[in-house]
Amino acid sequence: VSLRVLTVLPPRESYAEGHAGAIALLVSRLAQPGDRITGKAITDVPLPGGSFVPLEISGWPLPQRLKYGMACLSEARDFKPDLIEVHNRPDLALFLSRFAPVRLILHNDPGSMRGAKTPAQRQRLAERLLVCGVSRWVVERFSDRCGPLSVAIQPNCITLEDIPEVRPRRQTVLFAGRVVADKGVDAFVRAWATIRSCYPGWTATLMGADRFGPDSPETPFLARLRPEAEKAGVFMTGYQPHARILDAMAEAAIVVVPSRWSEPFGMTALEAMACGAAVIVSPVGALPDVVGSAALLASPDAPGALEGALCHLMDQAALRSELGQKGRERAAMFGLEQARAQLLELRQQAVSFSRGSAVP
């Protein structure tokens, strides 16, 4: 049975081509033809998945959170969905569950989210609606200090058809992502500065900016990093569209994901594996689960760890090739076909769950 589904994006997420973050890209990838996607207004072309309708946010001097919630309710009353899917906003999901069946998809640690900070709040959410996390790590964080809960895992996915064909590998080490301290980008620059003189035939590239989109601001962190990167011989490209990043991953011999932040999934690592690069990730959050045995682990701040892993790979072409093949096989487990089949199943579960839960 085809369900009418309204998908609600987080307030800061843009559903526009060239400006979309990870959540919007995933929503577009998985969207069914009849899905309606809603969120903040955009001025550029919307992403192709589903049908995007901007929220009409009230001009009244009310808290932004309240105005966003009321706009979502108005959109739900207009569309009359069988199910509302809310991404990363537990408080909004609980509010909307009073009016329609809701499925909450968590992309980050819920312990820092409004409406899910305490075990009691998370318990209440799990009793009222179907909660899904993008990784085992997220589900464990949601269940922490709670009684028995029913929480599903809905892993992120990739469109394998969008992955560029295998190309000759350049002797390049690539970092791709947000250029912020949490992502360990300064550790990458430090590591490269330490070892570059031993590898004159190799180059290092840093793709990304503080946030997604071409109008990303210059930040104090970036201002400090630029001269360090220049001195280390790391080429900084600034923000690049998603397709360009995939092209770079398909050419780079090595991709590093040196996050300090406990990555709730690790999309960059998954995409790098799909592109056939040899990958190095931090042993934090969901990253070890996502890569399995198809990547090397190295802590960004452990003395010599990242440098050692890079040298290990740059010294051994056979190991790079082996990890590249393992990575492609691992990434195939996260393909779109499997993800869409699971999505339809979870949607039906969410509607059935809502019918069986008591609404006060």
Where are each of the predicted segments found?
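Conserved donor-binding/catalytic core segment of Leloir-type glycosyltransferases
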Residues: 6, 132, 165-183, 187-196, ...
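N-terminal strand-loop element at the rim of the active site
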Residues: 9-17, 25-64, 92, 212
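Short His-centered aromatic/hydrophobic patch
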Residues: 86-91, 106
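Carbohydrate-associated surface elements
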Residues: 137, 157
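Nucleotide-activated donor-binding/catalytic signature segment of Leloir-type glycosyltransferases, i.e.
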Residues: 218-243
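Short alpha-helical donor nucleotide-sugar binding micro-motif in glycosyltransferases
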Residues: 239, 247-252
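Acidic donor-binding loop of glycosyltransferase active sites
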Residues: 250-264, 277
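Conserved acidic donor-binding segment of nucleotide-sugar-dependent glycosyltransferases
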Residues: 293-304, 312-317
